[in-house]
Amino acid sequence: NIADYYINGLPKIGAWRDMHIRIKGPAVEKLQEVFLTMWNKETKQQIGGDEYFPFGEDSLNAAPVHAGHQVAIVQRAPKISPEAMRHAYIAAINSAERKIQIINPYFTPTSSIRRAIEKAVNRGVRVEIMIPGKSDISFTPDAGFYLANQLRKKGAHIYVYNGGFHHSKVMMVDERFCTVGSTNLNSRSLRYDYEINAFVFDLPVTAQLTDIFSADKQNSTIMTKEVYKKRTPWKRFVGWFAHLFTPVL
């Protein structure tokens, strides 16, 4: 996102926190392909050619592996790959054996994502989910608090970030691989919008994100039954009511 308040924050939410990733090598060409496809569609231009794809066409069809590093670019496009992102997230969650860590700003997960998280908890995986205490929008965060509390009841560990608005969309699995991208864990991202994520199979990169998560815990409140009840009855009602609309949020 590009705007002044993404850099300077907003008075009602404080500092804006986000997560970006720099990718080098053949995996970039998939990002280039997605960008040019949308650019050409909107501008009616036909930009392309070998100069934009120096690694060749093969790089678009396979995730490259170099010295133990693997990057897969997953795109969700409504008419091309409508289920790709949902399937990628569910597969990642289902693969977890020890730990899942999620940071997501508009956390109103679809029923299939919630079921995958609950199954992970039931098989002994520690699931840690970080959501922002403040948001740049209304209604959706109330549903997010309600749904996060429901997952807390199932055994997930919920952290409410207090250091501003955490707009990051990341997930780490077993400290083995991670994903960083534009995808929110809500119906809009998984069913309607254009989204793109990098799934990075790399221990050092995943360790960096894990360290950031651990540091952010120090600036977070652990959601407990008592903490959730501190929300006003009206806020709790709005959360319950809002969650009924999660299929379109």
Region spans (language model):
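Charged, low-complexity intrinsically disordered terminal segments
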Residues: 1-249
